[in-house]
Structures are given as C-alpha cells and as structure tokens.
Amino acid sequence: MILCFSGTGNSRYIAKKIAAELEDEIVDVNAKIKAADYSPVKTGENVIVVTPTYAWRIPRIVSDWLSKTKLLSAKRIWFVMNCGSEIGNASKYNSSLAERKHLCYMGTSQILMPENYIAMFNAPQLEEAKEIV
C-alpha cells in the first residue's frame, strides 16, 4: 500500500511510479485529510509513505494524520520523500513515528525533484527540471 500526500504533483508522480513497479495501489492522503477521514486503512503488511519534504521532515499534517489513523495489517513502513536538495534529519522523525505506531521502520529515501518552494528558492528552468526528473 502506498500512502501519498502531494502538494504540487511531485509526490504523486513518484507514488505512481512506485505503484506501477510494485503493482500496488495508492491511497490519496490529501483527500483523507481534507475529509477529516481518520478511519482505518486496509494496508497489507507493507506501507510506503510518499510525501514532499517540509522543513526537513514530512509535513506535520501528514504525521498528524498517520498518528490518528490505524493502518490495518501493517507491519513495515518505508518513507519516500522528495526534495529540492536534502531531507535533513527526517529519518529520525520518521523512525520515531513508526515506533509510536508499532511498525518496523524500514528506512527513508530521498528523491531529488525540481525545486518548487519559490518563496525561498528559484525554480529551475525547464531544461534543468527535465534533467532532474
């Protein structure tokens, strides 16, 4: 099961690639959060959380949703985070979240995507963005 939260589409793009490779399904965490839906999610044993990096960790709104939502049958959890340059110490926070949910933390992976936090950084030109992706 892939749990995806996407603000600009980068995470959704990554989640779709992972889902195709693993022949797994994606749950749209954005929709769940907007609906205040904290009902249990039937995940199977393996859960992959795909999110952008906000302030060098997963978005607080996502960690709050994960904390409140029961992941049925889940045993192992991975985190895949996209970023413009780095995810900082996100793995520490992700490991702690996994522990609180009584899940085996399998790791955090970062995927570089075109920078899109334009309040602080310049977005890359089209050719550079294509090279990154």
Model-based region annotation:
Residues 1-2, 6-33, 37-51, 55-133:
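FMN-binding flavodoxin-like domain, especially the glycine-rich phosphate-binding loop
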